[in-house]
């Protein structure tokens, strides 16, 4: 995973391979960064647009991926690409370079706070941005866990379940 922030836009690219041996190779990382630079230069809106975008030599990202696959002898693929736009953007890539997150904020926040929030989003793997976007079965599952936890609290021992569900 590689990321880049340019002004009010953040870009994230995940180039997948089969082994850690290839993934930890500096040349492989350089290739991922080169593809990310193509994304930034062309301001690619989505994965399909990025795959069709060309570098300065006239090669598409799709061709770059195929070439890298031939060089390494492994199946290489552009597993994920995202671009966001917000007044303030932050990015985090986990130390193993296998996980990363880009976030947009509607106002500027201290860099340390942005870093911490982005790191936590990466670690927690959220399923949605808000409860409204969350699948109903996930909300119900989490609600059941919360009610069970409240039942275990001695302070709630005498409260009816109907009341616990409203807390």
Regions found by a protein language model. Give the residues of each.
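N-terminal assembly/interaction segments in proteins that build large macromolecular machines
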Residues: 1-167
